């Protein structure tokens, strides 16, 4: 098994060497309009879409395999009275192939105001570009087309050395005597460019997430007890080192991350663990169109409520099963190409080996993204 895995990695490196700067899947799925693309006085019809076909073949006791075929659509009317103010109103639609009804059909409203060249605020539906800079261990990328779009309040800062953002996403709102809890997520992420020259750059990323379920004005569901407050936290810090190689392979990256988990409300915690940690070591190579990476994941009692299920110490498919120690080796290949300025296509394949059990899981997907503006009127 190990020999075949190494041979597959070498084959992917050979393929990718012949192939714009490669992006991560999180960057590829960015739909929200960048500030530098906003033009004052334009009233546009904007159409955002992401067609996806993702197949996850998972073995083991933690998560069952499944397939996600479908498309995400966001038709919008946008207006920018000035370069600093950008408004969107429209709809967020998700349809899975083989279903007659839309999986999600939600109204969309977003407003962004840029206080300065570096600092801006977003209200309503949030800017989820690059998934806030979160790694998949903390935030499952496919939530982009399975969950409701985030909505709340967000502040973003972009500088020459520091990029940071903080946000609160309100996922379930409650009124007096509602028989369910309010849900929201608070996040703070950033990366600091500690060193950079023509040959080497070093960034120091930090991520903090809090997930809360509670409320003071809700009541117990009919025939049941009032649920306790649940607050869970995840933390992450590390380094990302990129070496510019040139030639066919553009950069080689060496990354390391530490992750933490804490059940803040330990007295009412319903999960099997109240504290845990993990670390991730990753090396990758980037070519003009592709990225290949190999990583090692080691975790102890690690839980991330929004993270990719495969990495956790608790089972999603069997609520009674948990395993404190996890060790996973993974190899991933991601290819993407810009068709036009507003359209991109991508493909990825991933393999995961659970070291204790020897289970081999894999995932692959194909994606087509289109973000297009149609000018209706210039004021």
Language model regions located:
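Outer-membrane beta-barrel biogenesis signature
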Residues: 22-44, 127, 377-379
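Exposed, low-structure sequence patches enriched in small/polar residues
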Residues: 70, 108, 159-167, 179, ...
């Amino acid at each position: 098994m190990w020999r075949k895995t190494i041979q597959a990695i070498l084959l992917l490196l050979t393929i990718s060497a012949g192939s714009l700067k490669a992006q991560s899947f999180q960057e590829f799925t960015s739909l929200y309009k960048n500030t530098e693309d906003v033009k004052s006085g334009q009233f546009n019809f904007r159409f955002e879409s992401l067609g996806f076909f993702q197949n996850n073949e998972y073995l083991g006791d933690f998560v069952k395999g499944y397939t996600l075929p479908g498309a995400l659509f966001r038709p919008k009317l946008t207006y920018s009275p000035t370069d600093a103010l950008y408004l969107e109103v429209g709809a967020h639609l998700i349809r899975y192939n083989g279903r007659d009804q839309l999986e999600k059909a939600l109204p969309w409203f977003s407003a962004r105001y840029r206080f300065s060249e570096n600092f801006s605020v977003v209200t309503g539906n949030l800017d989820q570009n690059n998934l806030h800079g979160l790694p998949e261990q903390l935030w499952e990328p496919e939530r982009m087309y399975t969950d409701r779009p985030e909505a709340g309040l967000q502040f973003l800062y972009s500088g020459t050395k520091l990029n940071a953002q903080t946000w609160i996403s309100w996922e379930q709102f409650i009124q007096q005597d509602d028989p369910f809890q309010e849900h929201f997520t608070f996040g703070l992420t950033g990366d600091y460019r500690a060193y950079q020259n023509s040959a080497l750059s070093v960034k120091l990323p930090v991520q903090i997430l809090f997930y809360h379920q509670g409320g003071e004005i809700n009541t117990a569901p009919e025939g049941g007890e009032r649920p306790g407050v649940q607050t869970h936290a995840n933390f992450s810090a590390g380094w990302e080192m990129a070496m510019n190689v040139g030639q066919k392979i553009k950069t080689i990256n060496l990354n390391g991350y530490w992750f933490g988990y804490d059940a803040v409300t330990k007295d009412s915690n319903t999960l099997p663990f109240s504290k845990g940690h993990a670390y991730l070591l990753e090396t990758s190579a980037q070519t003009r169109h592709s990225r290949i990476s190999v990583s090692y994941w080691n975790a102890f009692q690690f839980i991330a409520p929004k993270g990719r299920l495969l990495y956790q110490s608790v089972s999603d498919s069997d609520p009674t099963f948990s395993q404190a120690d996890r060790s996973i080796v993974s190899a991933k290949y991601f290819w993407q190409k810009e068709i036009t300025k507003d359209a991109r296509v991508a493909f990825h394949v991933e393999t995961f080996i659970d070291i204790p059990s020897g289970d081999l899981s894999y995932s692959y997907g194909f994606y087509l993204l289109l973000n297009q503006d149609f000018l209706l009127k210039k004021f």
